[in-house]
């Protein structure tokens, strides 16, 4: 019953069907008001009226259900599952979108205790090959994304997919007890805006810090030395602040616009530090072009490392091996 209740809560189908059913009850009354000759109300018994309305309602409901499921079959579900020490739970899905899913489980790819430049490169190539192959075979024009893994992989994954296709994102809600997949709401109820600050030091390296899950102050950048910094953060931070489709898309638009307003000609290196949700990282990768935007070095963060940003992937490097920026050969404490 719990799964049925969740489906009814999440799906628009039953609401539309119920509304149509209620309206059809009033068909005889509408016919009488409009003086339609189709219904001879004096000759029709109550039983006949109920039968006509019931049959008509069932036909409409069945047609809508068929259309609903045929429409959903245009979706391809992108499931990213993989980060050391974490794995998405094996949920039995209640949502009909899953009838069209193509899961890409990356959990086995990304687990590597050594984390050398070679192992990161091999993991990236395997992910790239997996998603590229399935994407080329895929005839879907709509995609649904959910999951999490290392930030650089999420960003590069977003760049693999065309921006002219429709994407929908689920959010992985994590509590002390469980991790579950939830649909984003259409609109957010609370006010939470992005604010930005540009710190100019006339340096050749620019760091762009995006913080919605943690505050910017907690993102230590001392290992990079003196740099120019663009900070983009939300008034309220936390894992659940991006709780709606509108907020996800609006914030993505704002972040991309603020990044593109920068005079990139001044900088020889641009570093992206993203402390935000997996779906936001994926969309930023999709929105920031490999052709027209500059080369971004997207860093992985590890709170247990001696240096919190131990490695990165570069977005525009043609050679995949050159994409991997591995900073500390002797640092195995992460």
What function would you assign to each model-found segment?
Residues 2-71:
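Hydrophobic, helix-forming membrane-interacting segments
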Residues 80-85, 145-150, 209-214, 273-277, ...:
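Structural motif
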Residues 135-178, 281-284, 289-291:
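Hydrophobic, ordered structural segments
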Residues 190-257:
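Redox- and metal-dependent alpha/beta enzyme cores, enriched for Fe-S-associated oxidoreductases
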């Amino acid at each position: 019953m719990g799964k049925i209740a969740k489906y009814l809560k999440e799906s628009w189908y039953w609401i539309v069907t119920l509304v149509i059913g209620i309206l059809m009850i009033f068909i005889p009354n509408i016919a009488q008001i409009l003086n339609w000759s189709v219904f001879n109300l004096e000759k029709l018994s109550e039983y006949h009226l109920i039968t006509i309305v019931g049959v008509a309602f069932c036909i409409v409901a069945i047609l809508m259900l068929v259309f609903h499921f045929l429409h959903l079959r245009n979706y391809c579900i992108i499931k990213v599952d993989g980060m050391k020490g974490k794995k998405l739970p094996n949920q039995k899905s209640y949502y009909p979108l899953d009838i069209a899913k193509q899961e890409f489980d990356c959990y086995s790819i990304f687990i590597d205790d050594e984390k050398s430049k070679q192992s990161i490169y091999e993991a990236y190539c395997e992910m790239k090959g997996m998603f590229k192959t399935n994407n080329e075979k895929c005839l879907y024009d709509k995609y649904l994304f959910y999951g999490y893994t290392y930030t650089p992989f999420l960003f590069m994954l977003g760049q693999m997919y065309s921006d002219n296709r429709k994407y929908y994102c689920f959010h992985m809600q994590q509590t002390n007890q469980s991790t579950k997949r939830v649909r984003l709401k259409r609109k957010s109820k609370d006010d939470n805006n992005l604010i930005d600050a540009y710190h100019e030091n006339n340096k050749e390296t620019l760091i762009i810090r995006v913080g919605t899950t943690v505050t910017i102050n907690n993102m230590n950048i001392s290992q990079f030395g003196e740099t120019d910094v663009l900070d983009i953060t939300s008034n309220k931070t936390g894992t659940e602040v991006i709780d709606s489709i509108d907020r996800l898309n609006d914030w993505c638009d704002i972040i991309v616009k603020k990044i593109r307003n920068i005079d990139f000609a001044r900088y020889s290196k641009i570093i992206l530090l993203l402390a935000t949700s997996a779906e936001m990282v994926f969309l930023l990768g999709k929105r920031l072009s490999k052709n027209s935007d500059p080369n971004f070095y997207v860093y992985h963060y590890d709170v247990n490392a001696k240096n919190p940003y131990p490695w990165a992937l570069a977005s525009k490097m043609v050679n995949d091996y050159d994409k991997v920026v591995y900073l500390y050969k002797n640092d195995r404490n992460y």
